[in-house]
Every structure is written in structure tokens, then in C-alpha cells.
Amino acid sequence: MSPKQVTCRYFLHGVCREGSRCLFSHDLATSKPSTVCRFFLRGQCAYGTRCRYDHVKPCNGTVFIPPQEMSPVLSPPPLFPAQEAAVPPTIPAPQRREKKTLVLRDRDLCGASVDPALQPGCITESQGSEGEAKPHSYLEAICTGLDESQDPASYPGAPQQLCPFAQAGECHCGDSCPYLHGDACEICGLQVLHPHDQEQRRDHEKLCMENFELDMERAFAVQASEGRVCSICMERVYEKQSPAQRRFRILSDCNHTYCLTCIRQWRCARQFDNPVIKSCPECRVISEFVIPSAYWVEDQSKKDELIEAFKQGMGKKLCKYFDQGRGTCPFGGKCLYLHSYPDGTRAQPEKPRKQLGSEGSVRFLNSLRLWDFIEDREQRGVPNAEVGKLGELFMHLSGADEELPAPFN
């Protein structure tokens, strides 16, 4: 038998790669097996033009259904004469409109070359008795609804969220991004301005301007602090090795420059009197406050703001002398630290009472108790010579040196 008389089995399945060069026959007339897509005959082929079977209608117009898919039809059993008399006559049902089966098909997967009027289940405008529209597939209905939906900007109360990636600097979605891309801010350069919300634009521009002014002030402060030299160690403060030492100590009543380490050593010295320690090492002007700062401050108004911020910061720390009511603070109401009890109640400020000692020392007396005097007397040492003199004086005053009278015989 010649190969041309044998039908190509790959061609029957629509996957023959040889085409006209194939040695076997590509004639469907001589092939007994049918290559017509049975799903196409029912209008349910999801592959469309990519289907390997033929999408053609039979010439006689009959639809071939495979035997395995035919449902068995059960014929009613024959009726006996007695049963035929008992069966009531059939009443014709009112004419109802025949329901037409609608098949949902993907528009992208359906065969584009096939005439829609030839596909079963499809209803054209001419077929409908009342001008019914062509039914859409599920995917087509969704896409059509999305395309015809109204723009969210037309709704006055619709929420419009700005794209977080565009706000950070770059959005890879571009024009296809589902979020709203804002206008670029002239100060920060980011797309953070809402195109429709004027209040949001004003708030952001105000906040951005405040941050810009703070950055400018910080830049000017750094520029003014770069060339400052400590008056004690004669080193540039910003050129010290440790970053923790690159800080200034601002004196409240003096404009001389000192670093953090040098002025701390000066204020902690014990070989000098208190007025000397509190005064400036160079001009001898007494300063009550020494404030640490990362930038050099020379203007008096800036110093006042710095002192106020320093007081507020110290007022949040507990005083180690007061010790939540268990101790006594020698500074009283002038202490910068927090005086509070364990329950959080603030202590009432009281003025410290001062007492000048015999040696010229000053003592702070906040509370006077008898036991304090007893402890002071016991702890105070008395020389032995003074003890002997006190004993002789006591004996003289008591009359112990007088001769006792002679006893009666």
C-alpha cells in the first residue's frame, strides 16, 4: 500500500509539522475518523482558533454527538386497557416562552473566524422577538463595566489615595498605577501634593517651609561653630577625636568659648571657693547656668531659649538629694531637678534655712529636730584638757571642796 493512501494520524489531530511535504495523505474525504471538534458543535470550545480540531459544520446540518455522551432515553412502559381508561386526558399547558440557553464564553479564547450567528446558543439582534441585545460573556461584562465606570474624580466624596511609591520618589507602574500621582512640591521635590485637595496642599507647604527654615538655621549654626576654639585647651571643638567631646558649654552670662570637658573640670574643682568656680575662667563673670549644646550660641535671645529648654529637660529627672521624700535637698525650691514622691505628687517648694557655724561654714537647715542636736553633740569631739577644766568647775560649784563636819561620838 502506498503511503499516500494512508491518512496521516498527526494531521487528523492537527499537529502535522510536515505540511505539504508529508508522505501520508492529508485528505479528509478518505479518513473515516471525524476531526470536527465536538465542543465546537456544542458551542463550548475554549481554545478557539488554537484548537487542533476542525471548527466546521457538517454539510447535512446534523450535529454529531459521541455515543458515550448520549443520555439514554427511557420510554414509558406500555399501558394496559384498564390503565388507559384511568389516565386523565392531558390538558395542554399554556404557551410559554421557550428559555434559550446562554453560554458564557471567553471573548479572547473563542474562535474569531467563526460566524457568531452559526454558533449554537448565540442570539443575534434579528433573532430576538423584542430586539434583545447580544449576551456578553462574564469576562466581557466585567471589562465593559470597568471601562464604562465613571471616573472616581467625578464623585465629590470619593476617597483618592496618593501613590506611596510616587511620594517616596519613584513609581514603577507609571501611567498604569491604580493610585493617584500627586504634583511635585517645589521645596522637597516629591510628588506629595494632592491635585484636588487644596487644604492638604496648604498643610504640606506650610510644614515643608517650617522644616526648610529649621534646616537653614541648623546649617548657619554649623557654619558659625566650625571655627570656634576652646579658651582652655586651645583646640577646635569640632576637630576633637571623640564625637562626644565635640560639644560646647554655653555660659549664661559670658560669650567665651569652652568645650564640654574643660569647663566641666573647672566647675568640679574643689580647691577654689564657690564664686571662683561659678565664674568664667577668662573674664571672671559669674554664670549661674552652664548649658551643653551641639552648636555655638552667642545671641542672648537664643541663650534664653536654650536655658529654658535646659530647665525643662532637667525638670523631668528626679533629684538625687530629695530621693522621693526620703532625703533633703540643700537647694530647696531653687533646685532644677524634680522633687516628687513615689506616687507622683510634686513636693511643695520650701526655702532652705541657713546656719553659720563657728568655723565660718554655712549649713542648710530644712528641718530642725532635737535628735539632730543630740547627734551633733555626740559626734563633736572635746579635748581632754577642756574635760578636766569642766570637771573642776563642776566640783567647785557643787561645794565638794568644803570640809565635811566631824561625826558625833
UniProtKB/Swiss-Prot annotation:
Q: Which InterPro entries match?
A: MKRN-like (IPR045072), Znf-CCCH_4 (IPR041367), Znf-RING_euk (IPR027370), Znf_CCCH (IPR000571), Znf_CCCH_sf (IPR036855), Znf_RING (IPR001841), Znf_RING/FYVE/PHD (IPR013083), Znf_RING_CS (IPR017907)
Zinc finger (C3H1-type) locations?
A: 2-29, 31-58, 157-184, 313-342
Does this entry carry the keyword Nucleus? yes
Any one Gene Ontology MF annotation carried by this entry is: ubiquitin protein ligase activity
Q: Report the subcellular localization.
A: Cytoplasm; Nucleus
One BP term from GO: phosphatidylinositol 3-kinase/protein kinase B signal transduction
A GO cellular component annotation here is:
cytoplasm
Where does the entry say this protein is expressed, by tissue? In adult males, highly expressed in testis, small intestine, large intestine, stomach, heart, liver, kidney, lung and muscle. Consistent with its role as a neurogenic inhibitor, expression is much lower in the brain, and also in skin.
Q: What is its EC number?
A: 2.3.2.27
**Catalysed reactions listed for this entry:** S-ubiquitinyl-[E2 ubiquitin-conjugating enzyme]-L-cysteine + [acceptor protein]-L-lysine = [E2 ubiquitin-conjugating enzyme]-L-cysteine + N(6)-ubiquitinyl-[acceptor protein]-L-lysine
Q: Which CDD domains match?
A: RING-HC_MKRN2
Enumerate the residue ranges forming zinc fingers (RING-type).
230-284
| EC class | transferase
* Keywords carried by this UniProt record: Cytoplasm, Developmental protein, Differentiation, Metal-binding, Neurogenesis, Nucleus, Repeat, Transcription, Transcription regulation, Transferase, Ubl conjugation pathway, Zinc, Zinc-finger
Q: Residues annotated as region Makorin-type Cys-His?
A: 185-214
Query: What is the annotated role of this protein in its UniProt record?
Result: E3 ubiquitin ligase catalyzing the covalent attachment of ubiquitin moieties onto substrate proteins. Inhibits neurogenesis and axis formation during embryonic development by modulating the phosphatidylinositol 3-kinase (PI3K) pathway. Acts downstream of PI3K and akt1 to up-regulate gsk3b mRNA expression.
PANTHER family from the xrefs? Answer: E3 UBIQUITIN-PROTEIN LIGASE MAKORIN-2, MAKORIN-RELATED
The molecule here is called E3 ubiquitin-protein ligase makorin-2
